Swiss-Prot record:
InterPro entries: Cyt_b6/f_cplx_su6 (IPR007802)
Spans through the membrane: 4-24
Lineage: Eukaryota, Viridiplantae, Streptophyta, Embryophyta, Tracheophyta
UniProt membrane topology term: Single-pass membrane protein
GO terms of biological process kind: photosynthesis
Alphabetical list of Pfam families matching this protein: PetL (PF05115)
Gene source species: Cucumis sativus (Cucumber)
Quaternary data: The 4 large subunits of the cytochrome b6-f complex are cytochrome b6, subunit IV (17 kDa polypeptide, PetD), cytochrome f and the Rieske protein, while the 4 small subunits are PetG, PetL, PetM and PetN. The complex functions as a dimer.
Protein name: Cytochrome b6-f complex subunit 6
Amino acid sequence: MLTITSYFGFLLAVLTITSALFIGLNKIRLI
């Protein structure tokens, strides 16, 4: 149970970082 929770948290963190980087790149391209 603990491993599933930690894995889900890790996956969520990776998704957040990836989306943040993607938005940042899009903003740089728009400028």
